[in-house]
């Protein structure tokens, strides 16, 4: 087997040759597919538990505020029937929970696969995180991931994002399974939690958050992530 590496900076090509027996390739493929199958089975199991618990989720505040139920019903109908919805409501009415609650109920019913909550302000991110924390008190095992800009979460500022320059990129994919396993033990993947797991597992926190996207139910992100998130969520 030949692999061609092209170094753009110095305009050089490097050809690496490796020889494997058929048995070695068969064993590698079998082991790889087994690991992948185990991860997919785990994902299915997590979602079954999540959907079961969300089906019994009550509105976290007990009673809806004036106008809050109307928003929640509109959000649910929009998800169920498709389309777009724009809502304008006074400050303090509880818009964040009025959006998240019906979206979570629809998630349990299989009407969509994931939620993306984008906001232009830090206060919006905190409102979403606190609302989901209230939901978690009832027991639903929904996993929320708060994305942080690369320049703010990077452990090696000023270094290139590859193994030759950054120790957290070196051997990243060898340590990724352990990092994913540790992260998935946490119900909320805030910036602090992502950084803690990344330091413990010695992996890049920004890349870890990116690789966690298929595993989470709610993504909370800055408005600038809007156009890049959907392809990554698949």
Language model features: what each stretch is:
Residues 26, 44-54, 58, 111-219, ...:
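A substrate-engagement module of RecA-like helicase motors
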């Amino acid at each position: 087997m030949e692999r061609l590496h092209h170094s753009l900076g110095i305009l050089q090509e490097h050809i690496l040759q490796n020889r494997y027996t058929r048995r070695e390739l068969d064993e590698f493929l079998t082991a790889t597919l087994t690991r992948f199958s185990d991860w997919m089975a785990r994902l299915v199991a997590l979602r079954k538990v999540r959907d079961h618990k969300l089906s019994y989720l009550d509105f976290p505040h007990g009673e809806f505020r004036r106008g809050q139920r109307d928003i929640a019903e509109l959000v649910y109908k929009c998800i169920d029937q498709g389309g777009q919805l724009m809502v304008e409501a006074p400050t303090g009415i509880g818009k964040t929970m009025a959006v998240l609650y019906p979206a979570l109920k629809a998630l349990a019913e299989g009407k969509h696969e994931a939620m993306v909550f984008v906001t232009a302000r830090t206060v919006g991110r905190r409102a979403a995180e606190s609302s989901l924390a209230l939901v978690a008190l009832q027991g639903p095992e929904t996993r929320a991931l708060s994305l942080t800009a690369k320049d703010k979460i990077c452990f090696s500022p000023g270094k290139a994002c590859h193994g030759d320059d950054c120790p957290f990129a070196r051997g990243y994919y060898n340590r990724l399974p352990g990092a994913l396993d540790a992260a998935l033990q946490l119900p909320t993947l805030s910036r602090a939690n992502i950084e803690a797991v990344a330091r413990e597992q010695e992996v890049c926190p920004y890349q870890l958050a990116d690789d966690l996207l298929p595993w989470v139910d709610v993504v909370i992100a800055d408005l600038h992530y809007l156009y890049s998130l959907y392809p990554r969520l698949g």
